[in-house]
């Protein structure tokens, strides 16, 4: 399942380095949320525990990986790469419970700088383990080729993804693969990047392991976690600005795509000053109406006297090919755009319609015992303690203090 410490998304490593530099003593708590109707079993939980305790705990940065990071990721400081060389996952940071209703409860607690790497690793493990247990291969493959189900599945999925990639390429949609967390499995993920990596419009992958394997660019900058964690230290109202300023302190203008929706786009634009707008190469959209947001971003840059055509808007909210094509056409000549496409590539819900991807997240819940929240521009994506969400919605003028979230 997890073959390497680099089998993770780049932004987990970039945020880890920033945490080590600015908040080395902070402690974090994360919670697993299953938004779907899937249930789990004792056998599933026992195998998940075994993988965490026996397999993931042994993963370490190899000498080859160490050299590759030094040669290909200049934004990582030598001291951080040394830290990563000595890093080991600590299974004691992960607590798993199966409830009487067969729901999975998972909590991660530990120093922020170490516990930060668990999220993607656990989500991709949970996903692959779930589909290993529940998939009926007979439904995935052509009956005529049932003698070799795994290879037939790979061939059919390769063709399916290849057609998607060619369509994006033909339409000039610059895109990257963002699908580690909810992938069907490691081998299928590998095949996806293999199929896509030679396309002119394929800009890279968020997965550092596959970026190394296929010689493409590792893609990623800031996740919601960075902004949420910073909010625990300065409060919600100016958390975006504090988080973006801190990112600049660490990376000096590298990796500079600002994530817009942690507390909704309105407070983002209030905090995204002319200084930040000039330093950051662009903005990422991850929830809400993308057309409306594109207009707002373009207008914001123009108000600040910045040419939008010198910036980039990255769309990453549950994208399908048709979405990307539509957005590319809408933004053409107004602002540069690119696309981060995740589950659609690594666990496509149309291809696997009989047993679709898990709708799950693992989100930061507390920093140093202080609850943190994500509000989003899509109500269903909000996460956090109910009382903390209620207060956050009030602070940002979205709801009255006594209104239910």
Curated annotation (Swiss-Prot):
One Pfam match: NAPRTase
InterPro entries per UniProt: N/Namide_PRibTrfase, NAPRTase_N, Nic_PRibTrfase, Nic_PRibTrfase-Fam, Nicotinate_pribotase-like_C
E.C. number: 6.3.4.21
SUPFAM superfamilies per UniProt: Nicotinate/Quinolinate PRTase C-terminal domain-like, Nicotinate/Quinolinate PRTase N-terminal domain-like
Pathway: Cofactor biosynthesis; NAD(+) biosynthesis; nicotinate D-ribonucleotide from nicotinate: step 1/1
The protein's enzyme class: ligase
Family indicated by similarity: Belongs to the NAPRTase family.
Protein name: Nicotinate phosphoribosyltransferase
């Amino acid at each position: 399942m997890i073959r390497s410490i680099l089998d993770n998304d780049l932004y987990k490593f970039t945020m880890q380095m920033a945490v080590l530099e600015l908040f080395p003593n902070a402690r974090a708590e994360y919670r697993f949320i299953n938004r779907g109707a899937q249930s789990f079993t004792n056998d599933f939980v026992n195998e998940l525990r075994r993988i965490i305790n026996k397999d993931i705990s042994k993963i370490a940065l190899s000498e080859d990986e160490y050299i590759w990071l030094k040669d290909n990721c200049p934004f990582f400081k030598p001291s951080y790469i040394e830290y990563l060389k000595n890093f080991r996952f600590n299974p004691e940071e992960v607590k798993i419970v199966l409830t009487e209703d067969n729901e999975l409860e998972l909590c991660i607690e530990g120093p922020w700088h170490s516990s930060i790497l668990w999220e993607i690793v656990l989500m991709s493990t949970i996903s692959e383990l779930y589909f290993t247990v529940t998939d009926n291969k007979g439904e995935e493959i052509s009956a005529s080729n049932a003698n070799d189900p795994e290879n037939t599945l790979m061939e059919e999925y390769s063709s399916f993804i290849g057609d998607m990639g060619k369509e994006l390429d033909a339409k000039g949609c610059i895109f990257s693969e963002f699908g580690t967390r909810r992938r069907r499995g490691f081998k299928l993920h590998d095949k996806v990047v293999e199929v896509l990596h030679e396309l002119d419009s394929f800009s890279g992958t968020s997965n550092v392991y596959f970026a190394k394997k296929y010689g493409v660019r590792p893609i990623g900058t800031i996740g919601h976690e960075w902004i949420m964690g910073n909010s625990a230290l300065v409060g919600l109202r100016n958390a975006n600005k504090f988080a973006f300023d801190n990112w600049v302190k660490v990376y000096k203008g590298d990796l500079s795509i600002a994530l817009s929706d942690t507390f909704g786009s309105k407070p983002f634009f209030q905090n995204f000053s002319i200084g930040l707008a000039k330093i950051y190469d662009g903005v990422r959209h991850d929830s809400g109406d993308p057309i409306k947001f594109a207009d707002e971003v373009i207008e914001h840059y123009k108000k600040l006297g910045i040419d939008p055509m010198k910036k980039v808007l990255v769309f990453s909210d549950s994208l399908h090919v048709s979405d990307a094509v539509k957005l590319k056409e809408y933004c053409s000549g107004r602002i540069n755009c690119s696309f981060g496409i995740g589950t659609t590539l690594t666990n496509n819900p149309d291809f696997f319609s009989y047993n679709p991807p898990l709708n799950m997240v693992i989100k930061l819940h507390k920093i140093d015992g202080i609850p943190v929240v994500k509000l989003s521009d899509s109500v269903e994506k909000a996460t956090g303690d109910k009382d903390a969400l209620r207060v956050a919605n009030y602070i940002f003028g979205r709801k009255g203090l006594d209104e239910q979230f």
